[in-house]
Amino acid sequence: MIQNQIKEQSLKVKMCGMRRKEDIAYANEVKPDAIGYIFFSKSKRYVTGQQARELDQNLDQKILSVGVFVNETIEKVTEIANEVPLDVIQLHGDEDVIYIEQLRQQTDKEIWKAVRVKDTKDIKEAQQLPVDKLLLDTFTEEKDMYGGT
């Protein structure tokens, strides 16, 4: 059973979609494990690398800074990851093993991958990806729906 294969870990909390100074102030108050900046231009919570860098300067250093990317070029991901700078790169699109391996050669940042889960087969396949952490997201039939479910 899949539950037996998952290592016991404590629950982690990430607040995603940080866009305003007030968002960062609230995060500093409630102390999640991580916050996320969305670097997907089709998202209503999109921020630029410059905006994220300015916000991140006020973030409590104990809180991980995560950049969320959807089908972005490796060059752009590493550029933004270094500009902010991010602690973690989260891939939330259709990135495959080859993409992840190439990205890993370009950065020392932790890499997380969000996968849309329809059934346990999706989880088993995702466990084979060369990433540091997996995030399980609700499956949706909408073709270009990434996150926000």
Which sequence ranges carry the predicted segments?
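Conserved N-terminal beta1-alpha1 strand-loop-helix module at the mouth
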Residues: 1-149
